[in-house]
Amino acid sequence: GFAAATILRGVPLIQIPTTLLSQVDSSVGGKVAIDLKAGKNLAGAFWQPKLVLIDPDVLDSLPNVTFADGMAEVIKYGCIADRTFFRQLNQCDGRTGVMEQIEQVLRTCCGMKADVVIRDERDTGLRMLLNFGHTLGHAYEKAYHYETYTHGQAVAAGMCRAAEIGVRLGRTPAEAPERIQTMVRKFGLPDRIPCTLEAYRDAIGLDKKGVGSQIHVILLQELGQAVAVPMEKEALLAQIAEVERECL
């Protein structure tokens, strides 16, 4: 995608995603980027594909860890936008249950993302909600040098931690963290990843939702509804530190 946006000032792009994560997330929306030494996706553009071809049959070939990687993003959609979809996922018997209704799952996820992107292509408002779990998730990825945990594993743990922070701030219902933790564990994803406060600080400093001393933190008002809350970065770090202490 980044190459298509860059070569000759842009050439047509067709996406043919072959993992669950790319089918429900990165192939839809037009964000194209490459990683830099300083962090993920720091050089990029918005470049919409002319066509996205999704074949759910290719998912049968994925190792369980790669399938689970995509399930983190699937679960995210239920958390931020569709309580009924979250309940539907909760009733699935792991990977087998999801694959039994995979076409509906793909349509639901892609539809939700497309609806957001149509209204906020450039990620200045509503689209920020799609980053639920990602600020902390990027901290986990970078802290472990992008080797120990996959993107989906990091996002899963980030969603769980963000839900706990939301409860502390009085924004998120008390039962939400446990429900998300149960869901991610069902699909073989971690609900916690050890991380230092300095790693969190580095990730928050690089987060594109930040402006000056503030950052928009994506929290849940309830399961199925997210909100972007402006916070001082140091205040967010203080909340993270408290949650980390409570989990020792």
Q: Which residues fall in each region the model found?
A:
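C-terminal charged capping/lid subdomain of soluble metabolic enzymes
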Residues: 72-75, 171-248
